[in-house]
Structure formats: structure tokens, C-alpha cells
Amino acid sequence: MAFELPNLPYATDALEPHIDKQTMEIHHDKHHNTYVTKLNSAVEGTDLESKSIEEIVANLDSVPEDIQTAVRNNGGGHLNHSLFWELLTPNSEEKGTVVDKIKEQWGSLDEFKKEFADKAAARFGSGWAWLVVNNGQLEIVTTPNQDNPLTEGKTPILGLDVWEHAYYLKYQNKRPDYISAFWNVVNWEKVDELYNATK
């Protein structure tokens, strides 16, 4: 079965002023859609068509060599963005088991946000910043391009796209401003759900 572009769980202008409508439209309808199209083209006629995108990305080493790069880039792009849309909401509320765990590990939510923001800002070129669960502990990691922590056996529960296409229309070269705005639209309920599913 072909992979499909998921619908956004909110209107394209729902995250204004933090993430603008035009960026959301281009990011979802054009960029994400292209990843889906190219992923389907790469896996057509292979047994990967019947697997979930999570399973494929978690086992990239077993993907045939001739399509591995295309699947890594476009499969990662599809998985990362599918998760990203769900991790955003116009009704952000900082609560839940995961928030308590963050405070326990970092001392405060602000300390966590600072480390996450620093790592996201320092990610050279295109990539992602993630909060992952690794052996029961929370960890902040970054990945290049469309790589996903699942490939390294870590479970992502929060992710931030730091490709320029995610913010350039509104923030231009001011990536730290975009990262700061991100905290206003984090769907902590979804982060909590993903965290609890790892237990």
C-alpha cells in the first residue's frame, strides 16, 4: 500500500503568529508531499511497500543498497514530518508525566529548553533536534538531514525541524527566534503520550 500525506490536525493558520500560514502550506503541501511521492517511487515493487515507515526507518541497514539513500532521505522526511505535525498545537499546555520527568532530569523546564534550543541552533546545515527516550532516560540529540533517532535505536518523543524551509519565510536567518517561538506551540499532550508508550 502506498504511503500517504497525512492531513494536518489543525488549520494552516492555527499556529500563527509563531509559525505562519504560508510556511505551513508550503512545508506540508509541497515539501512533505514530495518526500511521500519520492518514497513511494523508491519502494515500488519491493516488500517495503507493506511495512510501516517506522519499521523501515528503524531498519535502514536492511533496505536494498540501490534504494537505501532514497529511502533514508524520503522515508525519514515522511516519518519526521508526520510526527512533527502532531507535535504542534495552538493550545500548548506544559503538563504531564514527561514534563515531570524533564524537571527531574534537567532541574527545570527552562534548563531543558535552553539545552534543547542551544543544540537545535548549533545543528550545522539542515537537520532536526530531538528529545528521545534512550534506555528509559531522556536525552537531547540532533540528526542531520532527514535522519531519525529510530535508526540508532532511540525513540523520538519531541522533534523540531531546523531545515531553513521550516522557518525562513518568517524568521529568515534568525533560527534562534524560530526555536524560541516553537515552545509556544508544543503539543505536550502528544509528547506525554509518546513518552508513556515507551514504558
Swiss-Prot record:
Give residues annotated as binding Mn(2+): H27, H81, D161, H165
Cofactor note (record) = Binds 1 Mn(2+) or Fe(3+) ion per subunit.
Q: What is the protein name stated in its UniProt record?
A: Superoxide dismutase [Mn/Fe]
Q: Whose protein is this, by species?
A: Staphylococcus haemolyticus (strain JCSC1435)
Reply yes or no: does the keyword Metal-binding apply. Answer: yes
Per its record, the protein catalyses:
2 superoxide + 2 H(+) = H2O2 + O2
PROSITE patterns recorded for this chain?
Answer: SOD_MN
**Family of this protein:** Belongs to the iron/manganese superoxide dismutase family.
